[in-house]
Every structure is written in structure tokens, then in C-alpha cells.
Amino acid sequence: MKKAFSLILALALALCCFSFTASADEAPVVLTVAVSDGTNIEDFNTNEMTLYIEEKLGVDLQITAYDSSEYDSKINIMINAGDKLEDIIVGGLGGDAAIFDYAQQGAIIPLTEYYYNPEIAVNLTEAIERVGFDFRGAMTMPDGEIYGIASLNQSWGNEYGNGRAWVYTPWLEALGATAPTTTAELEALLEKAVATDLNGNGQKDEIGLAGYDGISGQWFNWLMNAFTYCNNQKGWMQVNDGVVSFAYTTDEWRQGIEYIRGLMAKGLIPTENLTQDLATGYTGMVNTEDVTCFMVGYTNADRMTDIERKGLYTAVLPVTGPNGNRTTMFSQSVPSTGMVITADCENPEMAFRVGDLMVCEELSITTRFGKKGVEWDYVSELENGSDYECPYSPHFPPFIALYHDSQYWGSGAMQNVSWMQKNPFIRQYGIAAGMAYAAGTMTQFDLEFANGATLYQTAGLTPKETVQKLIYSAEEQQIVTDVKTDLNTYIKETNAAWLTGAQELNDDTWNAYLKTIESMNAAEWLKVAQAAYDRSVGK
């Protein structure tokens, strides 16, 4: 083989990554690969992960790294021009609709037969056991075929990450209050917070609930879920008895708007929540010392830079509304496409085995966390494993010991160990939730974040039916595209006008709003969404 290979790396990985082993007497199978470049990846062709795959499978991966800023469009142009393609194209290529379109053009091939052959899909089959559900259904296109190797990161912390509320505990204690459980209790607490000089600076600058991005913001989702299920990331769609509809056309939505408008009218929620963005206004707001009572976001005190103060925010569950509704937005960990195999590939089974090997547990960890024995180790393999602790215990035991993750992943430093998640990977909940740290090194922030994630995961406030992953055909996607932008703009602007009081919300304006939505072909979007949803649940 033309490239040198580290025997130590091979031995370290061979125990956990399953595949057939190529004969040393056979010439390597040449496979060309297209991938988007990475500023912190030295050379894909000499990368340790590449070398391991080549040695294990008896292949010669000839990799071309394209400019990441134009990668998807580059591939699209090549396909539409009928150009010869690399055997393997790594990446999501613009999403499911684009991938299905490429399949319909004959540019990429179905992999379904390989997926359902456990002798070929060795690691994918094992991954189904690891993650606890058969993700092949979520990879299946409208024609019943699977066209990509899956990428999946199950994250205990991410699934409710955009809908968690956090309260500043020193203020809660100063007010002699407890976490609110109803919309009425929340309003009363916010009234006390903004009326009291809690930070002791003699100014009336206390903020009840900080947020950004208007009705697309996390703060709005959290409040509206006291009235009806609300998830802007899924187009504000909800499902009742198998029927997909828009939350923003319901009477409960109107009640929620009236409630939130009342909070804004009293100055309990700043109107800046409707106009400011994350990078500027919101970040500046929450980094003004001791001014914010409530925040809603991925982490406790999201975007706050003071790590000690962040640790003083604790998670609060959604409140119950006057009609008894109490739900929380939920974004399930679902697979996406990590790579496809083109019709130009002369050995598609071997190309599939490359993707299959990439998703084995150890390579899936390596592509994110770095080199085993240097950046991380399995806690179970350490003599001093009991010295490591995990903030998610007892729900998840310590699984991987991390030594300097911020230097490997967060620094942007050049490395040649892994593909930095450019490739397919599959990680179960226990990996991210089982990240372990040397005893005594976890911060209060780490603990509060884990407690918040666990609180929402175990509360049981997710509706039985929700929209998660909708795979559209190219024709269906065009219908969505034609309707979505203008409709969403109208929804945002009209609801913002009601929330600020710029427009009165009454029967006349509400009915006019519903008629306008109807005139903008919302029903056409719902029709294709319903079809995609039915496919996703096997109808």
C-alpha cells in the first residue's frame, strides 16, 4: 500500500470496529472520495482514520477535498452536467429532497439491499442495537429505498435543548419564591422580579424573561407550550390523531398570544425579545451583570460569559396554562445522510463497507473526540476509572474519560487524527451523556446543565405525536419552498404586531389572519407534510 500505516492504531481500533479483513495478497480496491475540506484537517489522504480504513478493508481511498463554502453547489453542478463523479460523496448534499432528486436522476444508487444484509452492514446492524431503535426507516426515501449511510448523534442534552427555561436562583431565594408551575404563578413571579431592586444598584433594570428572534425564539416556544404544542423548528406543526396541522391557527394559540401580550404590556418581558438577534442584542443583554431572572435556551444562561454566574441558573419545567396544557418542544435525535455512493462506482459493496466501518462505535467517537489514549479512553479500560465522574449519573454512568476536549475540538488547531465529523458516525446516548471528568473538576455549570437536560427528558411532557423528520420528494419540496418563506414572514410579522400592541387582537383581526393564511396556500404545504408524515410512521 502506498501509504504508511500505524500498527498501534490498527490494534487499538480492531477490537471495536467490525468488518471483514482484506487479504494481504490482493491489490487494494481503489475508491475515489469527494469530501468538503476542513480548516483543521491536515490531509485527508494521510489522516490516521483514512489509513486505518484502508488497512482494515484493503482499499486505497483517493480523496479530493473541495472548498466547503461551495461543496454542495459544486456537487450539484457536476451531477446536473452529467460529469463523472467520485465513487463516494461524503456529506448531506443539501438535505433529503436533494438526495432523492439525485437518486431519481440516477446519479446515486440505492443501498437498501446492503443495509438489510447483516454480513455487509456489520457495524450499521450493531449500531441499531446501540441506539435502541431501527433508524433505517428514518433514512428511507419516498420510493422505499435508502440512498445514504446514516449519521446519528443521540444526545440527551440536545433533544429538549431549545426549549428549556432557567431561573436565576439567587433572585428566586431573595423573593422567597419557588419555581412557578402555572402561567398565573409565572406572571406573579415576574411582577415581583421587575418591581424589586434585586441587584441592589438602585435602578429599575431587572428583566423578567430575556429572549430573541421573536416567535421563532426559544422563549416564545416555552411560553406558548402552556397553551398548545409549539415547536418553531418543525414549522410550528403539531399532530393530533395522525393529522398534521399548524399550531398558529388554533384558538389555543390565540389565547397564548393574548397572555404573552399581557406580560409585555406590563413590562415583564422586554419588547426587544421580538427584534433582537442572538449575536448582538441578546448576548449584550444577558452579559449585563445581574439583570435577568429567566432565560430560555440550550444551556443555563445561554451566551453568558461568566461561568460562575451561569452555574446559578437552574432549570424550570414548562408551566401549565389555563386550559391545562403543559408541553415542551422536542427534537428527537434522528439520522441524516453522511455519505452516498454514486452510479460511477464500480465496486459499490466495498464503498458501502467503507461507510459501514466509519459508523462503528470507536471511529464514531474518534471523529469527534480524537485519538484514543491521547484525547480520550473508555472508563471501563482505565485502572483508575473510579476516579472519573459524570454529571449525568446515575442515568448514565461514566463512559469515556476526556482529557482535553476543548483543545482538540474547540480550539480549531490543525490535526490529522480524524475527519472531524465530516464522515458518517453513529453515537448512542451513553457517549455524550457519559463524558467523564476527573473527580473534582466538574463545575456547578456542568451539573446544572446536566440536571436541566435530565429534568426535561424525564418529565413526560412531550405529546405522543410530534413531527420530527419529514422526507420530501423534489416535487413536494418545491411546494414547501413556494409557500414557506412568505407564509412564515406573515406569521411572524402579524403575531409580533399583536404582541407589541401595534395591532389589536380581536375577532376581526383573527379571522382576517386565518383567511390570509388560507390564501397563501398553507393547505398545500400541509398536504405534502401530511404525506411525508404518513410515510415516516409507516402508513
Model-derived segments and spans:
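Conserved N-terminal structural module of periplasmic/extracytoplasmic solute-binding proteins
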Residues: 6, 19-188, 231-236, 244-248, ...
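Bacterial N-terminal signal peptides
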Residues: 8-17
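Loop/turn elements at helix/coil->beta-strand transitions in domains of secreted/extracellular proteins
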Residues: 27-31, 57-61, 82-87, 105-109, ...
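Conserved small-residue motifs centered on glycine
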Residues: 36, 363-496
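Secretory-pathway/luminal and periplasmic proteins that interact with or process carbohydrate-rich
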Residues: 84, 97-101, 194-203, 215-223, ...
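Extracytoplasmic/periplasmic substrate-binding proteins
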Residues: 100, 212-236, 261-426
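Helix-loop-helix "hinge/cap" segment bordering the ligand-binding cleft or interdomain interface
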Residues: 112, 141-218, 238-284, 339-374, ...
